[in-house]
């Protein structure tokens, strides 16, 4: 019987569905293990071969853990809200719900074909009201909470209201925005609206004025990673910086916990470092600077207060409220022009771009330690959200300050020199000098001190003179949580007298209403402004913005634990059983977005007692990207003639991308090429050796480069098991690598050879004969190797091990059930269809999914013989096979009396013989 993968995979998948073999429930008799993929956004294009890489790896690990006796939770769902579906709806008039439903059906079909072991009864979609009910519920909990810095915990806002009524807000150690001081009497005398405005400074979900990336063409706020080079990633529309009233989450309150708890996680050090940098903890001081000629001060944060004597100018962020205060009439036009220019640049671009720009405000500040006036400039290399949005510039010891000073011809004063060296003239420098260590100069009472001592003494001086305070600062910002779009979660908020109020929980979910168009209204309101009756029963209007894309993905891993629960996000019992995600697989692009927000969300729920662990993802593995392998044809200019790759240098040619699906091993199928596009119907070709050979390059998979490979096509030609094995065979999971079908035939031939171990022309060839020592050695070597590979995520090295084992068993003409049954189990995580089929054919009870992983026996792995390379004067001349337990003396003697030795000894006695037991013999003549 031949290996008919199409019949096998169709029947096996049908049997799995019928028997519900992947259904999972809490089982206290088994140890739980939760494996999760970062769920996909269901785009209209469907999956290409790069998408399943991480899914296949997690599926192998899930199947392996089941075989090891674990109760494995391995679910899948869809991150279904988002901008792409809405843009498509605007272009076509189709409702996003309809296109999303079609796309998820397509994804499900593709995922099923690959044979994943998902428990589909736990499927979730973020656009399902029964799911986003719990996103809305979590938002309400944040709205009704504040963060107590002293307890390092979220607490009910009602407790804070009681404190205000008792003592006002003096001396409170809580996370808050800009606020005014008030007494208990003043609080009590406030109107409800005034009190609500005060509370907005403390809520974990709050309305605030913030700078955003505003895209007028799309009519919405965009995240930093949705903007590139000043335009939207989707559509290429201009984006500007704009201050807007937005819903925000006070993520910054959790900065220290987010940083500290990284040390408890089994993540790569590079990913942890990315998050550390994003959180950006820095210790320093806040200092007060007075405006010259005005009764006004402003605060700056610095990590190097000791360099205060090197300050030669101040810089404000363009968004700073102080800009209006410090700009003189003489400079107003120049400042306004500059502010308009900077609106077109995102924060991320401002951080990464090294070009120098700025404008003088016309005003001066007073250095609090020297009393000298220093000019105040405005520049976009200072960010409003970090520190106070104002900096003291020390150009001698900061690269960006140095570049700014050089560009605008501002003074540069050196205040730190390497120990034992004199100060030098900054006019001769090419860049700022390092100031992390050294001795202070030009710094008054700090002169002669080490940097470390100067930092400590300056902080003490600032405290004593009441010039500021010591402070820890974080780069991490609060998350902007509203989008002016339709296709997202509605906020469970209504407005009364202009102030937001929480919807009662028993009225959740607040469902998305129908609208006639998915565009902003004529008056500029978000699309929900088009909805009829978008208000409470009492007539109070609902919020018109919707939640951002990361809202639905911030706690989805919890819902998988208990997806049918109507009364809670997750029951206590389900959460205490599964606890956390043991293995999370996804791309590095989520390091500073989703992975920060999910950790924050989980910690908040932990504070409320909803979840039992503070961290959601115990181990995280980032899969690399499968890149496209593009092919090119070479058209002779001004003709429709194409020249083969090896002859292209002889002509003036233009390289053109060609569909990789009409190329095999870089050889173009000319007939299919002519049929591919009308303009190529009459194409002529100049061949080499009767073939048209294409050029190639490694590029991102993209429809525009015609290098997208559909997994359906691979499965139709080779089968899902071949696809699974080949994706793992391409290289280490964490590394990016090119997709290249040139090697897939070898993997498919391996499966045919594997099949032939079990079947011949007469049918099943497996017998109950006892295995030989060599067969046991081959099997147990494989069991050990593959188990270790899976545990270390080295899936690529398992594939050659399978091939070697099958070659050895084929050569041995193995038919023993004692060998071939365990072999099926070991291969089953990688190739589940062929192994399930053969398992059933061998009459083994139950599915191979519920089998037990075989344990290897070290006794079978002991080498009885060792193959020694024998060298003469350092060059290997022959090999000799000897018993593994032979003594060094006997190995030496055996090597010297071997028939091949006489030729190299030439009748001489060896000067020296070196024997490395089990490795090599070297004879010095």
From Swiss-Prot:
The record's annotation in PANTHER family points to: LEUCINE--TRNA LIGASE, MITOCHONDRIAL, LEUCYL-TRNA SYNTHETASE
What HAMAP family does the database record attribute to this sequence? Leu_tRNA_synth_B
Signal peptide residues on this chain, from the entry's feature table: none
Protein name per Swiss-Prot or TrEMBL: Leucine--tRNA ligase
The record's section on NCBIfam families has: leuS_bact (TIGR00396)
Q: Pfam family of this protein, just one?
A: tRNA-synt_1_2
Main site of residence?
cytoplasm
KW Cytoplasm (keyword) present:
yes
EC numbers listed for it are 6.1.1.4
Residue ranges annotated as coiled coil are: none
* Reactions it catalyzes: tRNA(Leu) + L-leucine + ATP = L-leucyl-tRNA(Leu) + AMP + diphosphate
**Positions occupied by motif 'KMSKS' region:** 700-704
Q: Keywords of this protein's UniProt record, alphabetized?
A: Aminoacyl-tRNA synthetase, ATP-binding, Cytoplasm, Ligase, Nucleotide-binding, Protein biosynthesis
Location of motif 'HIGH' region in this chain is 40-51
Q: What's the family? A: Belongs to the class-I aminoacyl-tRNA synthetase family.
The species this protein was found in: Porphyromonas gingivalis (strain ATCC BAA-308 / W83)
Q: Which positions bind ATP?
A: 703
């Amino acid at each position: 019987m031949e290996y008919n993968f199409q019949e096998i995979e169709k029947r096996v998948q049908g049997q799995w569905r019928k028997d519900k073999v992947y259904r999972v429930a809490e089982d206290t008799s088994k140890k739980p293990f939760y494996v999760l993929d970062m769920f996909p956004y269901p785009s209209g294009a469907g999956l290409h071969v790069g998408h399943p890489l991480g899914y296949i790896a997690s599926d192998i690990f899930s199947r392996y853990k089941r075989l090891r006796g674990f109760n494995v939770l391995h679910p899948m769902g869809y991150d279904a809200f988002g901008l792409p579906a809405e843009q498509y709806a605007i272009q076509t008039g189709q409702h996003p719900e309809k296109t999303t439903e079609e796309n998820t059906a397509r994804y499900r079909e593709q995922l099923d074909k690959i044979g994943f072991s998902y428990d589909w009864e736990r499927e979730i979609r973020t656009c399902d009201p029964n799911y986003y009910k719990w996103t809305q519920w979590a938002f309400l909990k944040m709205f009704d909470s504040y963060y107590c810095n002293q307890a390092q915990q979220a607490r009910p806002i009602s407790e804070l209201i009681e404190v205000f009524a008792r003592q006002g807000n003096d001396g409170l150690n809580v996370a808050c925005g800009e606020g005014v001081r008030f007494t208990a009497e003043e609080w009590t005398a406030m109107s409800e609206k005034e009190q609500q405005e005060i509370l907005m400074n403390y809520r974990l979900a709050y309305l605030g004025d913030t700078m955003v990336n505003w895209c007028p063409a799309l009519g919405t706020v965009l995240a930093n990673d949705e903007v590139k080079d000043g335009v939207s990633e989707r559509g290429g529309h201009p984006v500007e910086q704009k201050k807007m009233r937005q819903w925000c989450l006070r993520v910054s309150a959790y900065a220290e916990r987010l940083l500290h708890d990284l040390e408890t996680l089994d993540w790569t050090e590079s990913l942890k470092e990315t998050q550390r940098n994003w959180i950006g903890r820095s210790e320093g001081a806040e200092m007060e600077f007075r405006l010259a000629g005005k009764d006004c001060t402003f605060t700056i944060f610095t990590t190097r207060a000791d360099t205060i004597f090197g300050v030669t100018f101040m810089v404000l962020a363009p968004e700073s409220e102080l800009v209006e205060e410090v700009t003189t009439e003489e400079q107003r036009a120049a400042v306004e022009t500059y502010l308009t220019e900077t609106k077109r640049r995102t924060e991320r671009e401002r951080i990464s771009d090294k070009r120098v720009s700025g404008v003088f405000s016309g005003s001066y500040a007073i250095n609090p330690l020297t009393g000298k006036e220093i000019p105040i400039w405005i520049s976009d290399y200072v960010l409003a959200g970090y520190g106070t949005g104002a900096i003291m510039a020390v150009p001698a010891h900061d690269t960006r300050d140095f570049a700014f000073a050089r560009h605008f011809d501002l003074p540069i004063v050196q205040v730190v020199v390497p120990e034992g060296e004199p100060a030098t003239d900054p006019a001769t420098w090419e860049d700022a000098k390092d100031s992390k260590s050294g001795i202070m100069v030009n710094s008054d009472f700090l002169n002669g001190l080490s940097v470390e001592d100067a930092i400590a003494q300056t902080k003490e001086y600032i405290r004593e003179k009441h010039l500021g305070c010591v402070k820890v600062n974080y780069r991490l910002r609060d998350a902007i949580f509203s989008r002016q779009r339709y296709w997202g979660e509605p906020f469970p908020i209504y407005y009364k007298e202009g102030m937001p109020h929480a919807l009662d929980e028993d009225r959740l979910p607040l469902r998305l209403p129908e609208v006639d168009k998915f565009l902003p209204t004529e008056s500029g309101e978000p699309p929900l402004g088009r909805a009829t009756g978008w208000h409470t029963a009492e007539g109070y209007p609902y919020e018109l913005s919707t939640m951002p894309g990361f809202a639905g993905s911030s706690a989805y891993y919890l819902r998988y634990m208990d997806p049918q629960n109507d009364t809670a996000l997750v029951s206590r019992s389900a959460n205490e059983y599964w606890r956390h995600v043991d293995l999370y697989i996804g791309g590095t692009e989520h390091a500073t977005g989703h992975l920060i927000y999910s950790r924050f969300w989980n910690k908040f729920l932990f504070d409320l007692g909803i979840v039992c662990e503070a961290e959601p993802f115990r181990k995280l593995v980032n899969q690399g990207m499968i890149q496209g392998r593009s092919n090119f044809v070479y058209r002779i200019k001004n003709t429709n003639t194409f020249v083969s790759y090896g002859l292209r240098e002889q002509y003036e040619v233009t390289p053109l991308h060609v569909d990789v699906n009409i190329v095999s091993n870089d050889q173009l199928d000319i007939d299919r090429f002519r049929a591919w596009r009308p303009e190529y119907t009459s194409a002529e070709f100049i061949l080499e050796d009767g073939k048209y050979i294409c050029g190639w390059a490694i590029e991102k998979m993209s429809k525009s480069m015609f290098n997208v490979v559909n997994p359906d096509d691979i499965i139709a030609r080779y089968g899902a098991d071949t696809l699974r094995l080949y994706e793992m065979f391409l290289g280490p999971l964490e590394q990016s690598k090119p997709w290249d079908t040139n090697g897939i035939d070898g993997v498919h031939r391996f499966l045919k050879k594997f099949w032939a171990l079990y079947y011949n022309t007469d049918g099943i060839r497996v017998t109950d004969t006892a295995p030989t020592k060599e067969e046991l050695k081959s099997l147990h070597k494989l069991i050990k190797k593959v188990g270790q590979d899976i545990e270390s995520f080295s899936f690529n090295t398992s594939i050659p091990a399978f091939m070697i084992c099958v070659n050895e068993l084929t050569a041995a003409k193995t038919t023993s059930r004692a060998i071939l049954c365990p072999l099926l189990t070991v291969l089953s995580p990688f190739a589940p269809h062929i192994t399930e089929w053969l398992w059933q054919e061998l009459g083994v009870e139950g599915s191979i999914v519920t089998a037990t992983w075989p344990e290897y026996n070290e006794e079978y792995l002991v080498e009885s013989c060792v193959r020694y390379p024998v060298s003469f004067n350092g060059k290997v001349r022959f090999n000799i096979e000897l018993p593994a337990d032979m003594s060094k003396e006997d190995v030496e003697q055996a090597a010297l009396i071997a028939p091949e030795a006489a030729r190299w000894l030439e009748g001489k006695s060896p000067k020296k013989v070196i024997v490395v037991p089990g490795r090599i013999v070297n004879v010095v003549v």
